[in-house]
Amino acid sequence: MVLNAEGSVLLLIDLQQRLMPAIHDSEVVIARAARLAEAARLLGVPIRATQQYPAGLGATVPELAGYPAETLDKTSFSATGNPGFAALLPPGADQILIAGAEAHVCVLQTVLALLPAGRRVAVVADAVGSRDPADRQVALDRARQHGAEIVTSEMVLFEWLGDARNPKFREVQKLLR
């Protein structure tokens, strides 16, 4: 699947203040998720987020807190298992791009629930993390085995742009420096 900005939604899963310090390479995960969110904002891609038990894990990290138009607080590990999830996704968004934590828990369970429901899912490998890198890698492998695309944030940006003549090309390109 080639990603396109018009049919995408960026879903930020559980990138929370008290969870991220425990995530391996959390600074990279947050930076790549922020790159995606800023590109999504520039290109008009809807941004949504989830927060797993915010009373315990805190709110979305400050680097990303201003981006989502809507945030769903949840307790189910799969975002799809929470009331209100279906309404969280904008109509017409047939490509769901996922960034977040933990890759082997909430990210993977959400992916595994979305795929059989006919959703086209891409997991952004450099924008997902787990406490243990081995868990992250196995989660990416398993998501791929079940039909998810595994992409990088830079792949997403260039596919969303589609062409160097895109009026937002220079602004998005600056995010890669």
Predicted feature locations:
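Short acidic, Gly/Ser-rich segments with clustered Asp/Glu that frequently serve as metal-coordination loops
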Residues: Q17-P21
